[in-house]
């Protein structure tokens, strides 16, 4: 399971020009699921993200988590995080999980994040063609792959 986490001052996701999820200060999370992912990846990744100290404290140091600042979270599914560009110029998405495997894990990720943070998690729509707008604060962008835990 891969995630691109961006510290944002605001972010929104739209489908057919209609906003379906929006946040102010917090985290914009793009989540990609592969066939070998399972519930243990969801648990590990949500705990890791919720505790990442990437927000500044009173001294200007990155020392606070999204929970510490009562921040918000926007989650958007993105199978292209598992693109392989080793051959040719057209990406292969063979490692990305099929929807019947990925959708329940995506929903589990959202449920788990909702249990870890105070404000409700905003989302896009799994598998939809979406437009994402955000203001990356910092900028701070972090990439995490659950297959690289150690």
Where do the protein language model's features map onto the residues?
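N-terminal, polar/charged subdomain of small-to-medium soluble alpha/beta proteins
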Residues: 1-89, 104-150
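A charged helix-plus-loop insertion that forms the helical arch/lid used to bind
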Residues: 87-101
